[in-house]
Amino acid sequence: AGIKWLCLGIESADQKIRLEISKGKFEDVDITNIVKQVHEADINIIGNYMFGLPGDNMESMQKTLDLSKELKTLAWNAYAAMPLPGSQLYKEAIESGWDLPENYAGYSFHAYNTKPIPTDELTSKQILEFRDQAFLDYHTWPPFLDKVNHHFGQIAVDNIKEMTKIKLKR
């Protein structure tokens, strides 16, 4: 018995962006050291990342992808920042007059018609394109596939390779 998996909301490699989205509710931590300690405890990590957070640009999103590869978690999720109804980001979006989805399907993170918020430097389309490409980059990255093979075997690797052949329609 015991913990075998831990999901971490790593969000962004950019300290300023992380602190801004948490509005000071969380202290900044050395995520690299935390992930190392969790791995040493033989606990697998699901890393969650966000692209298109307020303040994000291509450079900061690339830093987040690079950090995710440095951490090399066994499971990887990436989302485009979405002002979900009821969230603080949604309240900010309403107050700022941002263009929001017209129906709930537009709030779905991976739907074809998802509509994340743009940043000052990036359009929603650019953020989605980056997120989709980052997903492919991570899941076809040989060190990740080697880690999956070590933990789950070649069948799991083959399934991932088949999955990454399917491109999302945009």
Where are these regions (language model features)?
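A structural motif corresponding to the C-terminal lobe/cap of the Radical SAM core domain
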Residues: 1-155
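Short, amphipathic C-terminal "tail helix"
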Residues: 154-170
